């Protein structure tokens, strides 16, 4: 169905240049993704332990199907940011036709209603998103080295295009170029690892690699079997997998391969950052889960998964320490992501039932929480279009149309402008910190408990310390929002215009109720925030799903 929509959007883009049709194209993509969710949900009951497709190039399991649905769901939430207008006008009851016309004219004159940035005018946007989603879905289900590279490149090239699709933005173009060049470097590592795997195994099938790895693993524990120990060395595949995994760690911005992500996140528009920071990582982590499960060497002295532990250590330290010095909000979120990637890698490297369950749960909850933060930041930017600021530093910011909120100090005193939105952001940030009873606390508890069970005592201590230190830059955001007076004030020209036209009773009465956040934005933020806040009352459903997925994986 995704391919049918891609073909339809390609044909539509070829015959029309109307930029106002972009919203309709986005809604078509939304309908397509909803259909994909329904189709995959119906397929869950017949998959059982897995189905091979196209001669073994793809392998569909219940875990991959669940995360297909999860990616489709998150993509719908991201795509609705450009499928519905972010603001709606408030018009007094019993208004005359004349007053309504004046109100509409006011909204367009002050650019409150139609100041959407370029993201509402690019008709190629949903098309590229569907290409990225296709690559992510294929990557999670791939079972061959060739299809792995094709899938990761399909996903990556779509993200490069998304990063540079805002042609009038110099920052966006520069960020997309950095992403493209360094993403190409990571692809070189993947290709090098692929060639080493093929040279050492003679096959491109992952099933063949898993069999060879099992044989070499048994050989390392079979000192009394010289016939088995003479023909193959386990470090052949382990070294190849080590090089192979470096490329994927680069793409998920795990330290020490993280240096591209803060610059790229900060440069590209916030809506694109939402997609790059979330969807691109989920597919790679699920692929790495399958790879770690089938190639972890229990009897060998050296395993490529040691790289995951080293990367986890660096990610926890660098993401926390360097994040303390950040004052730009998207750079701060980039380092926050690096720190959370450290927790995910710590759970991934354990390869036990408990650690895999912690990995799945942490990945799901962090993706949802991270999405909520980005949606709230985008919504705050939309809500401040009717305000002006006295701070001259904000006037020097570049690309304010596509990234209205760029520095943390822009959130100063926002609680006095929109208390409910501020509380939603605070709850999500407290979940990042790991404060009980929010969902982030239970996720970190599961990861640390699984790490202790696997004997990673030092890494567990580092994770606890970095969580405490990382709370400093999270609480700095809370302090700016709640404990400072706002720098923003109502645009006086709006109040004067309203007063002259008789739309309100006194000048300066323009408030947030005049331009409300649209219903899709409000509903999305409200539901995600309630899930984060009330997880303690519905934890059985989440944990049961993770347990079932782990049992399916370990029963294969």
UniProtKB/Swiss-Prot annotation:
Regions crossing the membrane: 58-78, 122-142, 145-165, 177-197, 239-259, 268-288, 304-324, 333-353, 358-378, 423-443, 455-475, 517-537
Alphabetical list of HAMAP family matching this protein: NDH1_NuoN_1
Source taxonomy: Eukaryota, Fungi, Dikarya, Ascomycota, Pezizomycotina
One Gene Ontology term of the molecular function aspect: NADH dehydrogenase (ubiquinone) activity
Superkingdom, taxonomy of origin: Eukaryota
Name this polypeptide is given: NADH-ubiquinone oxidoreductase chain 2
Any one GO BP annotation for this protein: ATP synthesis coupled electron transport
Organism: Podospora anserina (strain S / ATCC MYA-4624 / DSM 980 / FGSC 10383)
Similarity comment text for this entry: Belongs to the complex I subunit 2 family.
């Amino acid at each position: 169905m995704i391919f049918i929509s891609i073909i339809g959007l390609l044909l539509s883009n070829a015959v029309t240049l109307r930029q106002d049709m972009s919203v309709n194209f986005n809604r078509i993509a939304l309908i397509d993704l909803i259909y994909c969710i329904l189709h995959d949900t119906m397929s869950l009951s017949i998959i059982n332990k897995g189905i091979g497709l196209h001669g073994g190039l793809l392998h569909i399991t219940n875990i991959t199907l669940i995360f297909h649905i999860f990616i489709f769901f998150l993509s719908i939430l991201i795509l609705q940011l450009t499928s519905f207008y972010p603001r709606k006008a408030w018009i007094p009851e019993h208004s005359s036709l004349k007053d309504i016309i004046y109100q509409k004219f006011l909204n367009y004159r002050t650019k409150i209603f139609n100041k959407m940035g370029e993201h509402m005018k690019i008709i190629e946007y949903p098309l590229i998103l569907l290409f990225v989603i296709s690559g992510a879905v294929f990557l999670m289900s791939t079972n061959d080295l060739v299809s792995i590279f094709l899938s990761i490149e399909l996903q990556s090239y779509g993200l490069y295009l998304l990063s540079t699709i805002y042609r009038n933005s110099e920052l966006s173009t520069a960020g997309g170029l950095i992403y493209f060049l360094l993403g190409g470097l990571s692809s070189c590592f993947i290709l090098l690892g692929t060639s080493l795997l093929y040279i050492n195994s003679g096959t491109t099938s992952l099933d063949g690699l898993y069999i060879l790895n099992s044989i070499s693993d048994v050989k390392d524990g079979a000192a009394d079997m010289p016939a088995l120990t003479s023909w193959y060395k386990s470090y052949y595949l382990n070294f190849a997998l080590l090089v192979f995994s470096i490329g994927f760690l680069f793409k998920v911005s795990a330290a020490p391969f993280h240096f591209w992500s803060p610059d790229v996140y900060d440069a590209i528009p916030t809506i694109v950052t939402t997609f790059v920071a979330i969807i691109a990582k989920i597919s790679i982590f699920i692929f790495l889960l399958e790879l770690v499960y089938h190639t972890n060497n229990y009897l060998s002295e050296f395993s490529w998964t040691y790289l995951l532990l080293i990367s986890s250590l660096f990610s926890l330290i660098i993401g926390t320490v360097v994040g303390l010095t950040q004052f730009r909000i998207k750079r701060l979120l980039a380092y926050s992501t690096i720190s959370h990637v450290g927790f995910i890698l710590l759970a991934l490297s354990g390869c036990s039932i408990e650690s895999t369950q912690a990995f799945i749960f942490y990945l799901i909850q962090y993706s949802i929480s991270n999405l909520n933060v980005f949606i709230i930041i985008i919504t705050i930017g939309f809500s401040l279009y009717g305000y002006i600021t006295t701070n001259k530093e904000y006037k020097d910011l570049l690309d304010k149309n596509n990234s209205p909120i760029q520095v943390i100090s822009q959130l100063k005193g926002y609680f006095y402008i929109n208390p409910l939105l501020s509380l939603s952001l605070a709850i999500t940030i407290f979940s990042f910190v790991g404060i009980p009873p929010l969902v982030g606390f239970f996720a970190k508890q599961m990861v640390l408990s699984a790490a202790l069970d696997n004997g990673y005592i030092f890494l567990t201590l580092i994770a606890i310390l970095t969580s405490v230190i990382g709370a400093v830059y999270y609480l700095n955001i809370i302090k700016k929002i709640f404990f400072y007076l706002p720098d923003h004030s109502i645009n006086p020209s709006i109040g004067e215009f309203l007063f002259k036209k008789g739309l309100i009773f006194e000048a300066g009465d323009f408030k947030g109720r005049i331009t409300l956040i649209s219903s899709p934005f409000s509903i999305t933020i409200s539901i995600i925030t309630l899930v984060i806040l009330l997880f303690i009352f519905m934890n059985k459903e989440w944990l049961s799903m993770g347990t079932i997925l782990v049992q399916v994986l370990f029963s294969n």
